[in-house]
A protein has these predicted regions:
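Structural/interface elements that position substrates and couple domains in central-metabolism enzymes
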Residues: 1-439
Length: 439
């Protein structure tokens, strides 16, 4: 089938490349001339394992192309996906839908023949209704259907998530649209990936509810971690113990510095605002947002505590800047608030990330970016593991100890066992577990 993907960002590029790999003809449309130039040269503007090869292969085989001419692409398409950004609106926290509505208006002016218009972007309930109204206003005689098909891609494993999904949610009551969506996802249905049909509004809310639940689960285990520190329990064992219950499950029960990234912070806030507007507040999610916002500065206080109550005049080394491993995404990364809080407390900061340095330099000022974990350790009064990159899981602890001004490790991801670190002469603090002073 012929597919137009409006937006060549994270969701649009991954989805477009995967659809092309299924054999569809895909055109990714974007307004960013610099990004399009890079993509046409085979340069991928985001870091996602496997995406470079997928884009290159399908571009060379003629199934994937990039363009800025939305009207031309839409007029030739069977399916048009809207995969543009929906950031939090400044001032009130609602999702900013201006890019979605602008795209809908352009689509409306360009439709020819029956076309399925799909909102792939994460949007509040009722957005599909407005997209339909806008298209109809622009083109009263257009033959089209608007579908909600939310994405469930995790950065760092997005291709695997797209090709082997837990489920595919299709929100529409239009039978012709259901048939078209079934056809474009047919390769996945052969792998027994269930297509779940529901109403458009239900599909829109399902995406927000899913992300909010996962954010709440992360926040829950972080609260339990704080309690573990007070009571002398081990949060990792607590998480394992409750995760063995198949009603709960082990995923998203890893205590740490709080959630970040492009989805959870934005989507939980948007759900809170949507619920407030509907006079049906979601108090659990309101609490989740508040607790997570406070979490990052609480982690900075943990670092200060590990440094004998003050970091003024001290150098703190940060290992990991991105919000999670296997991505270069710095959006709402815990490192941003932690670094700022430590700077406010008088610390000098050195930092390293295996992939995220370029993006971090755009967002963080007044710190030293260095080229390895050991360069971070050199002269530091403490090192702080903020992101659990595999490269940080097997550091030479003896070498770290020799390089540091004072031997202190604050492990915000519980990567190490305290006894292993202390054995090498490094004081060790973690999250929700016993603190280990130097022997």
């Amino acid at each position: 089938m012929r597919i137009t993907m409006i937006g060549a960002g994270y969701v649009g590029l991954v989805s477009g490349a995967c659809f092309a790999d299924f054999g569809h003809q895909v055109c990714c449309v974007d307004r960013d001339a610099e990004k399009l130039a890079m993509l046409k040269l085979g340069k991928i503007p985001i870091y996602e394992p496997g995406l470079d090869d997928l884009v290159t292969t399908n571009t060379l085989q003629g199934r994937l192309r990039f363009d800025d001419n939305l009207a031309d692409a839409v007029s030739q398409s069977d399916v048009v996906f809207i995969a543009v950004g929906t950031p939090s609106r400044r001032g009130d926290g609602h999702a900013d839908l201006s890019f979605v509505y602008d795209a809908a208006a352009e689509v409306g002016r360009s439709l020819k023949g029956f076309t399925v218009v799909v909102t792939k972007s994460t949007v509040p309930v009722g957005t599909g209704d407005e997209v339909e109204r806008i298209i109809r206003e622009q083109n009263p005689d257009a033959d089209f259907a608007v579908v909600s098909n939310p994405e469930f891609l995790r950065e760092g494993s997005a291709i695997e998530d797209f090709k082997r999904p837990d489920r595919i949610i299709v929100g529409t009551d239009a039978e012709r649209a259901k048939a078209v969506m079934g056809e474009i996802y047919r390769p996945l249905s052969l792998n027994v990936a269930p297509i779940f049909h529901t109403s458009r509004r239900t599909a829109e809310l399902t995406k927000y509810a899913g992300n909010a639940f996962l954010a709440m689960k992360i926040t829950f285990i972080n609260e339990i971690a704080d309690l573990c520190e007070r009571l002398g329990a081990d949060v990792q064992d607590v998480a394992r113990g409750i995760g063995m219950d198949n009603r709960i499950g082990a995923k998203f029960l890893h205590a740490g510095p709080g959630y970040g990234g492009s989805c959870f912070p934005k989507d939980t806030l948007a759900l809170v605002k949507t619920a407030q507007d509907a006079a049906s507040p979601v108090r659990l999610i309101e609490a989740t947002v508040s607790i997570n916002d406070q979490r990052k500065r609480a982690m900075a206080r943990k670092v200060v505590e590990a440094c004998d109550g003050s970091v003024r005049g001290k150098t703190i080394g940060i290992l990991g800047l991105t919000f999670k491993p296997n991505t270069d995404d710095m959006r709402d990364a815990p490192s941003l608030a932690i670094i700022q809080a430590l700077k406010d407390a008088g610390a000098s900061i050195k930092a390293y990330d295996p992939v995220g340095m370029e993006q971090a330099r755009k967002m963080i000022e007044g710190i030293a970016f260095v080229e390895s974990a050991y360069a971070v350790a050199e002269g530091s009064h403490a090192i702080v593991i903020v992101t659990e990159w595999n490269a940080f899981r097997s550091l030479d602890l003896k070498r770290l100890r020799a390089l540091m001004a004072t031997p202190v490790m604050v492990d915000l991801r519980n990567v190490y066992r305290g006894e292993d670190v202390v054995k090498e002469g490094i004081a060790y603090s973690s999250v929700g577990r016993e603190r280990h002073p130097v022997l």
